[in-house]
Amino acid sequence: AILWTDGQPQYLTDGTTDALAYCIYSDGKDVYVGGYVQPASNKQGGIATIWKNGVAQSLTSGNTVAKVNAICIDGGKVYAAGSEKESGGRWKGVLWIDGVAQDFTDYVGTEVTGLYVKDGEYVIEGNMTETNSAKDICPYIWTSAGAQKVAETALCQGVGLAVAGNDIYVAGNEVAGYDSEYNQINIAYLWKNGVEQEL
């Protein structure tokens, strides 16, 4: 895992095991990177990790695979959203607040792609399948009030989140079909408060 500052690399791990960085967030002079590190003792595991100014903080034990996909700082607290693999290969959504985990989904297929926090209230954006099949994947947002499906169409996913005032924006795409050579064709969408706009 590497952080580049003005083009200069800073190695967050030593390369002896697999490690990936998925997200970055800056707060003043502090830079946070989120991802995962494969433990040397368990090649099937992955430790959800936050690096603050290059110093690693492990959020999980590494007994299973877990990762941090989005980070946000609010009120001096570090919020990290990601997912952890459960038995059967399904991913559950996890929100860590100052390192303390709380699940925001049940045992379903979940992938986080965005996080926003203000005054302790969070909005998490991602994709979820209730059957663990990619055929029914849909974008969702999660708040302290629960889950809300962004789009009803299957084979649809969100890839980015923005919040402005009371408005929640999700960018993503939907599988429209396949061309004559069976290449997948996607349509880009923007959802504002759940209302779809084709781009």
Please report, for each region that a protein language model flagged, where it lies by residue.
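Residue-level hotspots at or immediately adjacent to binding/recognition sites across diverse folds
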Residues: A1-L199
